[in-house]
């Protein structure tokens, strides 16, 4: 019974994890953070063209081997009528929140972000302090 559970664990957890790690190791990654692409992924429209309030939550895989397991996430806010987005993210445990450290929809360590959640209009305005 124990051997079957161990085999089941290996098949259902370790095999997919190893496969993903192998795939990830073959991806073209920057050697270090200085060489990574941090530019905008052009996922957001120009802030001036959006008249309503918006809140976006983005996530992108982190750099090097940690990208197998982890994502970096951040929140982008734009008040109604604002001419620019404001990005909030935390880099490192226990560090303060960074404001506009990177492009609102910028890549993270060369990895394109994905939109996790979006709130627009009056609902977004109610959530923005």
Predicted feature descriptions by range:
Residues 4-23:
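Hydrophobic membrane-insertion alpha-helices, especially the h-region
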Residues 28-42, 48-122:
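Glycine-rich catalytic cores of cysteine/serine-nucleophile enzymes that process amide/ester linkages
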Residues 121-129:
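A structural motif
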